[in-house]
């Protein structure tokens, strides 16, 4: 046990010298340590050589312990080994441990204690200090003075600290005494205040009691005075009653009693009559109340029906206005075609006159085969009669009229074979609506008659027009495959100018027109969201494929129509662009009641618009009786990186997906400026809307356009007959 304690103390001493904590002392470290302890370099080298037993130029803990034990065995007798180890021999006669080092301490240590005088009491762990003193005295006596100097410094600091502690204790005691004095003063002051309050309350209570007592005295005096007055009156009445004759009084009283009895009976009769009339009036009032309640309910139902009729009337009026605009445009186009027809007839007549005057005209008149058709513009008398009937029908029927006008187009309308590029915006107009038209031109058979007449084969020329229902007032035109016209006598090739799709055949176009004209349902889609999130730009990109950076804020509600092919079927969408400003929220909320779907937009570069999405969804749920499909659209995705680099807080895609999953809504990020994911978002929402409406029994929110479509030919007929 003693060896373990000795090793632990030696290890602690070694670690104090080992500043690098490497477990060994280099020669440089040992020299620096000896220089701090004021040991000469020669003595330091001698001590290092004695401690470095394995001659590896470093002192390990084992070398240090071995050298320390060897030095102790040379200089100390064996009887004092316990003193070196710091464990004095235990003796039952000396139980006090503090007296053991004094008995076994060296004379040098005792002399040092005498020199310290009273400061010895401030040395902590005096036993360990004495052991270290003896060890240093044995190993290196020159270090004793430095060790004594260190101990004196420690004793001085400990003494100062003890003095400071005493001063602090005195200060704390003074503070406690002062606090106690202040507390006693506060208690005295509180007692004084309480006494003053008690005195004031007692005075007030005494004053109030005196006032109450005075009031009671006054009341008592007034009552006594009233009693005295009544007593006097009673005495006077008693004196008067003694003087009145009793018989006369009895007769008068009987008459008065009889009169009062009759009056009482009459009043009772009147009371019964009044109660009866009140009961009748009450029953009539209840009947009137029930009638009023029934009438109010019926009036509310009528008002709801009227509101529904009003909405339908507004929709129909809007559609009629669109059709009227389309009719006016058709009328203008008919005028243009009529003028073109007149010009073509003039050219046709001139060409006939030229042919009649040519030498080949004799063959044309004499040959029965040539009377059928010798040129694209020659017609037989029979065909002329048919053409006259056809033209007369065209005057009444706008569809036939358009066919006739196209059949008689002049040669200037025939292309030379060079393609002409047209902007798609040339055919797009916000208020333009055109019915489906299919132009057919009959094929004229031609035969070859030797070399007298030129052989010109005129194949069938069909001008077709791809039609789609009103897409927000925009009509999409697609150029069709041009049909070539060849001639055996000439190598020229000409193409018919057409505004139809280049990748759609005639049969496909007819099928598409048939499908589009039978799309009777229009689904109401409402665009919602905060102001300046890009709803109007989204709608403009969807309907017109345009983007304008200087669009103004929407006031109230804007309306557009768009037709999309969803799962192979044409779907007409009514797109309602609502204002996102706070003052128009009530208007936007009213449009949610009959909506089939909602496009809820927010700005990915504006965190506030994303946080307000929950309020918009709550508004939609409050306004609708059933759950409707919602497509959450994060717009302006193209600006997110730029705004994030500028330090703005942007909404990431993960946040939008989590929020959409929370509410069971669809989600998509778009860019109205770049046009990305615009059509995809609307297609997904339209698909969900169609699924929901197909599964519902109540289809009140779907507008039936069959009546409006059936009226289009009649309206166009009336328009053309003007």
Curated annotation (Swiss-Prot):
Residues 480-491 have a biased composition (Low complexity). One of its GO terms (cellular component) is perinuclear region of cytoplasm. InterPro entries: EF-hand-dom_pair, EF_hand_dom, P-loop_NTPase, Rab, Small_GTP-bd, Small_GTPase. Residues 75-109, 355-384, 439-491 are annotated as: Disordered. Transmembrane segments: none annotated. GTP binds at residues 532-537, 635-638, 672-673. Keywords: Coiled coil, Cytoplasm, GTP-binding, Nucleotide-binding, Repeat. Residues 156-335 form a coiled coil. Pfam families: EF-hand_7 (PF13499), Ras (PF00071). It is found in: Cytoplasm, Perinuclear region. Residues 75-84 have a biased composition (Basic and acidic residues). PROSITE patterns: EF_HAND_2, RAB. The keyword Protein biosynthesis does not apply. Residues 5-39, 39-74 form the EF-hand domain. Residues 355-374 have a biased composition (Polar residues). GO terms for molecular function: calcium ion binding; GTP binding; GTPase activity. It comes from the Eukaryota. Homodimer. Binds predominantly GDP, and also GTP. Belongs to the small GTPase superfamily. Rab family. This is Ras and EF-hand domain-containing protein.
């Amino acid at each position: 046990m003693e060896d373990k304690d000795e090793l632990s103390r030696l290890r602690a001493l070694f670690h104090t010298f080992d500043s690098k904590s490497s477990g060994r002392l280099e020669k440089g470290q040992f020299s620096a340590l000896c220089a701090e302890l004021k040991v000469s370099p020669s003595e330091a080298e001698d001590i290092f050589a004695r401690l470095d037993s394995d001659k590896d130029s470093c002192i390990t803990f084992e070398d240090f312990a071995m050298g320390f034990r060897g030095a102790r065995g040379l200089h100390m007798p064996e009887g004092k080994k316990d003193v070196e180890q710091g464990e004095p021999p235990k003796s039952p006669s000396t139980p006090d441990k503090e007296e053991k080092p004094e008995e076994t301490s060296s004379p040098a240590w005792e002399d040092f204690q005498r020199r310290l005088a009273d400061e010895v009491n401030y040395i902590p762990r005096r036993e360990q200090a004495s052991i270290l003193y003896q060890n240093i005295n044995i190993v290196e006596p020159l270090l004793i003075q430095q060790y004594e100097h260190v101990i004196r410094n420690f004793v001085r600091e400990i003494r100062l600290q003890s003095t400071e502690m005493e001063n602090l204790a005195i200060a704390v005691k003074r503070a406690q005494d002062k606090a106690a004095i202040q507390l006693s003063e506060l208690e005295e002051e509180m007692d004084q205040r309480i006494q003053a309050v008690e005195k004031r309350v007692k005075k007030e209570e005494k004053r109030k009691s005196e006032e109450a007592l005075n009031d009671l005295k006054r009341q008592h005096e007034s009552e006594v005075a009233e009693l005295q007055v009544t007593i006097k009156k009673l005495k006077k009445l008693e004196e008067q009653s003694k003087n009145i004759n009793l018989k006369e009084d009895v007769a008068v009283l009987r008459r008065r009693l009889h009169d009062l009895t009759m009056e009482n009976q009459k009043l009772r009769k009147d009371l019964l009559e009044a109660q009866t009339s009140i009961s009748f009036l009450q029953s009539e009032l209840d009947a009137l109340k029930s009638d009023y309640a029934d009438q109010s309910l019926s009036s509310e139902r009528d008002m709801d029906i009227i509101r529904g009729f009003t909405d339908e009337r507004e929709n129909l009026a809007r559609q009629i206005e669109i059709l009227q605009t389309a009719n006016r445009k058709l009328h203008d186009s008919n005028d243009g075609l009529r003028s073109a027809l007149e010009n073509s007839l003039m050219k046709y007549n001139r060409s006939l006159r030229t042919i009649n005057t040519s030498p080949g005209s004799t063959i044309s008149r004499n040959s029965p085969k040539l009377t059928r058709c010798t040129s694209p513009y020659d017609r037989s008398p029979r065909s002329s009669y048919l053409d006259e009937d056809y033209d007369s029908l065209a005057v009444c029927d706008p569809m036939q009229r358009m066919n006739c006008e196209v059949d008689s187009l002049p040669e200037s309308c025939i292309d030379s074979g060079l393609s002409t590029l047209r902007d798609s915006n040339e055919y797009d107009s916000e208020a333009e609506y055109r019915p489906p038209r299919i132009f057919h031109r009959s094929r004229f058979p031609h035969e070859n008659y030797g070399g007298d007449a030129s052989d010109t084969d005129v194949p069938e020329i069909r001008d077709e027009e791809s039609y789609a229902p009103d897409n927000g007032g925009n009509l999409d035109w697609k150029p069709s495959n041009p049909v070539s016209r060849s001639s055996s006598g000439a190598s020229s090739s000409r193409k018919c100018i057409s505004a139809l799709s280049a990748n759609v055949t005639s049969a496909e176009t007819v099928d598409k027109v048939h499908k589009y004209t039978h799309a009777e349902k229009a689904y109401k889609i409402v665009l919602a969201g905060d102001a300046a999130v890009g709803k109007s730009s989204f709608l403009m990109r969807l309907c017109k494929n345009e983007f304008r950076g200087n669009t103004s804020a929407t006031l109230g509600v804007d309306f557009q129509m768009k037709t999309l092919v969803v799962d192979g079927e044409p779907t007409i969408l009514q797109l309602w662009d609502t204002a996102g400003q706070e003052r128009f929220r009530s208007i936007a909320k009213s449009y949610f009641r009959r909506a089939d779907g909602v496009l809820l937009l927010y700005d990915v570069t504006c965190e506030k618009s994303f946080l307000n999405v929950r309020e918009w969804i709550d508004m939609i749920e409050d306004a609708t009786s059933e759950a409707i499909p919602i497509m959450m659209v994060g717009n302006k995705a193209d600006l997110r990186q730029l705004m994030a680099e500028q330090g703005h807080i942007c909404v990431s895609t993960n946040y939008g997906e989590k929020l959409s999953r929370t509410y069971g809504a669809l989600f998509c990020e778009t860019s109205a400026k770049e046009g990305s994911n615009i059509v995809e978002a609307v297609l997904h929402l339209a698909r969900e809307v169609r699924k929901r409406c197909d599964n519902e029994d109540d289809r009140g929110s779907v507008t039936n356009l069959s009546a409006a479509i059936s009226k289009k030919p009649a309206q166009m007929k009336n328009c053309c007959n003007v």
